[in-house]
Amino acid sequence: MRSLIKKEIQDMHDEICCHMDKLHSNKVFIYPFNDESIEFKKKLDKIFNVNANFICDEEKDFKTSASNIVLFDEIVSHKDKSEFTIFLSNSDNDLWCIDFWKFENAGIPCENIINFKQFDYYCNLINNKIDYMEEHIKSLSLLSNDDKKTSSAYKTLDSLDKCGNVYNLLYDEISKKVYLRLIAKKIMRCKFYFDIYSPDQYFVDSIINLSPNEVFVDAGAYDGDTINKFIKLCKNKYKHIYAFEPDNSAFKNLVINAQSYDNISFVNAGLHNEAVTVKFENAIFGSSHIKSNDSNNCMQFVDKLFIKGDVLNLTPTFIKMDIEGSELAALNGFSNTIESFKPSLAICIYHKPEDIWEIPLCINNMNNNYKIFIRHHTYSDTETVCYAVN
């Protein structure tokens, strides 16, 4: 497994060098036009001897000489868009993603769309040797999204062996490629994932086949966004939906948004491997979670009931989980149900570093006939999902 990961890191390094080389052969543009763009243009010119122009949406946005400005419509109408490299100056992650989609939908190859932070990362990477990552590969000290390392219990060669076991379980070549690249990116501290992005989170049509008899368990239903998508894909033909959401504020919105649907049960509780009352943070933006041992801010936490899935006697055909790091415990709480009914699974594996090997192995232990897939569903380092279908 180590040799596969090292090769993936080398491949990633080579691809980045190739992207950087294109700066001298491609036409380079910066979008949107703002103060950061002006400073970045100076940097490209001074350090890399690259002359860049600005892109504006409309002529009224012009703030400099017209010779430096290209309208967005001109980019869209250009025949060979692979000749373009687009730099995005918005630092806000949501705005950056919107701009990324805008140019990707216009036909610019995704590898030719780079934001400023990504460019800085590329520069640092190609200016340093990659051999120094060997120690990280040995220990597999991956980082989670908040830059917390794996617990010391996982910093062993055993973790590398477990990743190898997961790799060998994966059903298709796409999953194997995504899995290796995920590990390589985490080891290399890379937070840009456009190269392994897949659309249709939880409902990848080549993996998940929905029927009119679905019993859908949505663990971490938030405000009903996934349920809305499920019902649309089912064309409103399903058997029942069970929506679990422990966050009080999100639960209220969930009921408001989904109460008009038929055959749906709302549960204002979380899922775990046992019935337990825990300290729970009602956070914003869908990131509510159980209090961790190292949390110092007790004022944010409230007592909340978490239940064991097996005691509910459900007969699910499809279980989705996005529950902020409690996925493994919730899976174990549903173990008898999963072993008995073999539902399709879509389980997030990005909240804790060890999830990328512990959760697939847990699923395989419950049913070794499952076909296991891995897909990644954002341009950043969140929303990695393990799928299992019987």
Model regions: which residues?
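Phosphate/nucleotide-binding beta-alpha loop and adjacent structural elements of enzyme active sites
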Residues: 1-29, 35-48, 60-85, 89-390
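Short beta-strand "acidic-cap" motif of Rossmann-like dinucleotide-binding folds
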Residues: 54-55, 243
